[in-house]
Amino acid sequence: MARLEVPRPATFVTLTGFMGVGKSRIGRELARALMLHFIDLDRYIERRTGISIPDIFRHLGEEAFRRMEKEAVRELVGKDYLVLSLGGGTFMDPESQKALLGRGPVVALWASPETILERAMRKPGERPLLQVENPLERIRTLLEARAPIYRKAHIHVSTDGRRVEEVVEEIVEKLWRHAEARGA
């Protein structure tokens, strides 16, 4: 049976950005809007390993987790009809970054450090990198270090003070513009 082809601006979209910017929630809705599958990289790793991300960090360390991320990206970059939501640090790996930038549009989601902290604190204990005395300062430091890498994305969208639907609408609009600019 032939696959029904519907017009869409891309068949593989990556969402990147710092933790707490809304990649997972927005990714699910974006996938629905584009009629694509959705994979959250952290959940994918948890399913494959049978271990939660906080437990991977706690028992195996960040380095082991980053290797798992890299391997998962290598595997998923070959898929089609997919919105892939990365973990906050995944795009920092040069090999993963190159593969994803070459595969399809990469969308960087942004939010202020205060918004990120407020969102992250909704699920205390789920953000291993924020288990420090001053999480807001940690967010600012990490965000400052990662921002130049996130800026390599094709598309940039702020999620501060916005509904998921608004953000998805802006992403779809920018994906179409990106596709048109590339002659797709």
Swiss-Prot record:
Q: Which GO terms describe its biological process?
A: amino acid biosynthetic process; aromatic amino acid family biosynthetic process; chorismate biosynthetic process
Binding sites annotated in the UniProt record for substrate: 42, 66, 88, 146
What EC number(s) has UniProt assigned to this enzyme?
Answer: 2.7.1.71
Q: Which residues bind Mg(2+)?
A: 24
What Pfam families is this protein classified in? SKI
**Which residues span the membrane?**
none
Q: Which GO terms describe its cellular component?
A: cytosol
Q: Where in the cell is it found?
A: Cytoplasm
Q: Which InterPro entries match?
A: P-loop_NTPase, Shikimate/glucono_kinase, Shikimate_kinase/TSH1, Shikimate_kinase_CS
Its annotated pathway? Metabolic intermediate biosynthesis; chorismate biosynthesis; chorismate from D-erythrose 4-phosphate and phosphoenolpyruvate: step 5/7
Q: Name one GO molecular function term.
A: ATP binding
From what superkingdom does this record's organism come?
A: Bacteria
The cofactor required is:
Mg(2+)
Task: Keywords in alphabetical order, please.
Answer: Amino-acid biosynthesis, Aromatic amino acid biosynthesis, ATP-binding, Cytoplasm, Kinase, Magnesium, Metal-binding, Nucleotide-binding, Transferase
Q: For this protein, what reaction is catalysed?
A: shikimate + ATP = 3-phosphoshikimate + ADP + H(+)
* PROSITE patterns assigned: SHIKIMATE_KINASE
Residues engaged in binding ATP:
20-25, 127, 162
What is written in the cofactor note of this entry?
Binds 1 Mg(2+) ion per subunit.
Q: How does it assemble?
A: Monomer.
PANTHER family to which the protein is assigned, alphabetical: SHIKIMATE KINASE, SHIKIMATE KINASE 1, CHLOROPLASTIC
Q: Which family does it belong to?
A: Belongs to the shikimate kinase family.
Function of this protein? Catalyzes the specific phosphorylation of the 3-hydroxyl group of shikimic acid using ATP as a cosubstrate.
Q: What is the name attached to this protein's record?
A: Shikimate kinase
